[in-house]
């Protein structure tokens, strides 16, 4: 069974035929009702797929609506007709919608026609306190640069706390809002004004990450995510902590204080550079390396476990899951505890079967509602050796 089918099975009749755009199937519901649907759906998914250890109740999102810190609009310009091919969403902050309306009103004027024709996407990223705007363009010449600088001045003066604006050149005109993959260099990335990095304030420290890098879309749930991961992974003094798909080091820095050593791995070069800079600034003896996490990488690039010294592994792969052979090679390291984080629920059955096959059993399953209004969950699964 797929998780979206379980969601559909538990939806009230009046929302089953709802015309919710872009997968926001549950957005019309009151949040209390949405949680009831999701809790019933994850239990049904678990039962039908005969998975071990039923899930705990879902941890609710502190902000169930207007929570998204990243949003985007695809720009389509035809003679006499400018369109943003996405619509305002109640899952996005009102400030995002206001910025898009401001930009639309500028781009529709004759003076900004060259820029309107050049645009692929407009992206807004940031936090609940400030925003950064990225203009993804298919070409860049002197006239377009002038218009970008003019529109950047408008953003600086607007009341929506737009602290930076940048241009990203994507000549492929791809359907991805940055490009088919996130950029690993800065050749096509141009600064209009403001810092080139974003930051996440975690209270006792602040982490920087690249404006093109991956970050959690629901800032309001990050505290619950870290708290839950800390409890489930259970790092102790003397443990070696291996943080795979670490991004800019969120879990490495939030959980790694108790560990004897921390090694973070991420394929995205700019994010790893930010993690290294944070380690230097915080004077932490952490190590970060860049590389594609596949079977060969785990076998050949990761340092071998130290006999007699426990290792705990956290892996937070993309929605498609891990590459073939990764779980097997990680299990051969014999970590005392694994925390596997899933943002794609449908990947869970196959992954848990593989962990089981190589000597690990489920200890606890904890879903978080990281994506309110949509038929998706972030699920934390703690595993231990049999």
Question: Where are each of the predicted segments found?
Answer:
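Rossmann-like S-adenosyl-L-methionine
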Residues: 3, 143-145, 150-386
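General N-terminal leader/first-domain-start detector
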Residues: 1-15
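Ser/Thr- (and often Asn-) enriched beta-sheet segments in non-cytosolic proteins
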Residues: 83, 118, 134, 197-201, ...
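Solvent-exposed residues in well-ordered beta-strands and their adjoining turns
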Residues: 74-78, 136-138, 384-386
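Extended interfacial segments that mediate partner engagement and assembly in macromolecular machines
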Residues: 8-12, 20-121, 126-130, 141-142
